[in-house]
Amino acid sequence: MASQPPFKTNFCSIFGSSFPNSTSESNTNTSTIQTSGIKLPVIDLSHLTSGEEVKRKRCVKQMVAAAKEWGFFQIVNHGIPKDVFEMMLLEEKKLFDQPFSVKVRERFSDLSKNSYRWGNPSATSPAQYSVSEAFHIILSEVSRISDDRNNLRTIVETYVQEIARVAQMICEILGKQVNVSSEYFENIFELENSFLRLNKYHPSVFGSEVFGLVPHTDTSFLTILSQDQIGGLELENNGQWISVKPCLEALTVNIGDMFQALSNGVYQSVRHRVISPANIERMSIAFFVCPYLETEIDCFGYPKKYRRFSFREYKEQSEHDVKETGDKVGLSRFLI
């Protein structure tokens, strides 16, 4: 049985028309252009624990500068064993290789309803359609993964333990530079509301360059991405879309909306997108650091750019905007 979702059939049932010729035509929210690829700042985390103060300070300075200028950076020597990524990728492939009819079943592998997602049910125009599928796994539900996928559950738990350690270190370093105490992040790293998103981007089924993931910012505090070497991630910088060159054995880190608000706009939550590969599949695993729904986000710094709001309020507003317009308006809703 086929594992790939019926993208063409689904698209035509929604829009009843042919797909735009290219992403440059379909991206109605910006007049930006495609540019050649860049290599994001690469930060060696081993310098934080090397015992050499000069290297540690330089590492922190590089991280802060990247978070301010790009909202993205890559990290190497993070201490996560290579086999953890290899085992996680293997389990990810097993999940996506299941027949489509099995993946869409309610409570597949005892994951919560709507954990499996594909296309873009919120799309209000052809420009907002995505040729991808994903498993959205909230960390508080990992222990519920069915016994027939015991290996998946064990490996996800190991992966989360490792990636969360790195995420907490980065959050505390960046937070300290904008006067946020490390205690602020303690409840966040109970990880009840954080989640993994396993992504599979399919080669274009429309005969043109299309989105694997439409332009957006992340709602999280921080996102850490493990990806293959296929490429396709692009970020918006100074009015241009820039393709990001994968760096072997590096993790990609990006600032989310919550950290931009908390830092009073010092750190940048940057719009990014994924272009579907031309003739090969692309896989990635994203870890999103999110607070409890009732966590209050209040800017550190004056004059404050954003009013105080809860994570629940932000999520509900974003979901409403997506339903109404197909796009998340984001932090501009909360400007003072």
UniProtKB/Swiss-Prot annotation:
Q: Where does Fe cation bind?
A: H216, D218, H272
One Pfam family for this entry, by name? 2OG-FeII_Oxy
Q: List the disulfide bonds.
A: none
Sites where the protein binds 2-oxoglutarate:
R282
Its Enzyme Commission number(s) read: 1.14.11.13
Provide the cofactor list for this protein: Fe(2+)
CC cofactor note: Binds 1 Fe(2+) ion per subunit.
Q: What class of enzyme is it?
A: oxidoreductase
Q: Entry's InterPro entries?
A: DIOX_N, IPNS-like_FE2OG_OXY, IPNS-like_sf, Iron_ascorbate_oxido_reductase, Oxoglu/Fe-dep_dioxygenase_dom
Q: Would you identify the family this protein belongs to, as annotated?
A: Belongs to the iron/ascorbate-dependent oxidoreductase family. GA2OX subfamily.
* Family annotation (PANTHER family): 2-OXOGLUTARATE (2OG) AND FE(II)-DEPENDENT OXYGENASE SUPERFAMILY PROTEIN-RELATED
Its recorded name reads: Gibberellin 2-beta-dioxygenase 7
Where does this protein come from, organism-wise? Arabidopsis thaliana
Q: What is the lineage of its organism?
A: Eukaryota, Viridiplantae, Streptophyta, Embryophyta, Tracheophyta
